[in-house]
């Protein structure tokens, strides 16, 4: 049965559109921003079983897509390197990797993540394991990837979903074979967390001219 947004949720969507218009003012026009948030909303409603997180997720998904669109329309020589981390559910490995990339790369790298079959929430064992090392991913929500985001990324890291990812010429694709944290305890997730840190550090060392934060 199709999801129907409440009056309050529809108001939240309008407020989200206003925030995005302020954020991208002077860069993207109002029509483009409204088209992207409406398209993002339609995509998410088509997948959802509940409307609870739809307004927040639609805003975040649209923001990432608009960030990607700005990259695609900009001079490549003026841009930071960008990485897209993909796994099946965008609930464990890709969220942890994105968390590490943001922590270690700071504002010198643009980070995106997504999943081929997004879960309802981020894996709690992954959240706890990352919090132990000072990386907060508790506020993240799994989301799908979009064509603009894939095209805007310089490096696309897949973890268990490579066959589902569209291939574009000129992109660098890397497949990381790592255990899926799903169903694992915090103790079992820690080695995955630490291996992701090592791999993200190595990737950032290739992409960034200065040493990464440790």
Where are these predicted regions, by residue range?
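A short, aliphatic-rich alpha-helical micro-motif
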Residues: 149-151
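Phosphate-binding/catalytic loops
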Residues: 2-5, 165-214
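Conserved active-site segments centered on acidic
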Residues: 68-146
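Conserved acidic residues
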Residues: 154
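Short glycine-rich anion-binding loops that position phosphate/pyrophosphate groups of nucleotides
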Residues: 91, 161-164
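A short N-terminal interaction module
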Residues: 2-39
């Amino acid at each position: 049965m199709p999801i129907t947004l409440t009056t309050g949720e529809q108001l939240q969507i309008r407020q989200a559109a206003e925030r995005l218009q302020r954020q991208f003012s002077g860069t993207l026009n109002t029509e483009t921003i409204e088209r992207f948030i409406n398209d993002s909303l339609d995509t998410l409603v088509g997948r959802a079983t509940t409307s609870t997180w739809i307004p927040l997720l639609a805003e975040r998904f649209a923001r990432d897509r608009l960030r990607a669109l700005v990259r695609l329309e900009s001079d490549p020589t003026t841009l930071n390197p960008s990485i897209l981390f993909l796994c099946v559910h965008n609930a464990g490995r890709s969220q942890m990797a994105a968390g590490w990339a943001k922590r270690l790369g700071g504002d010198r790298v643009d980070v995106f993540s997504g999943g081929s079959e997004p879960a309802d929430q981020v894996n709690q064992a992954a959240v706890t394991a990352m919090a132990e090392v000072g990386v907060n991913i508790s506020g993240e929500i799994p989301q799908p990837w979009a064509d603009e985001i894939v095209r805007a990324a310089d490096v696309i890291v897949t973890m268990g979903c490579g066959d589902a990812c569209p291939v574009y010429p000129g992109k660098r694709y890397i497949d990381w074979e790592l255990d899926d944290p799903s169903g694992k305890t915090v103790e079992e997730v820690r080695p995955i967390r630490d291996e992701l840190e090592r791999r993200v550090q190595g990737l950032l060392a290739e992409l960034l001219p200065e040493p990464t934060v440790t």
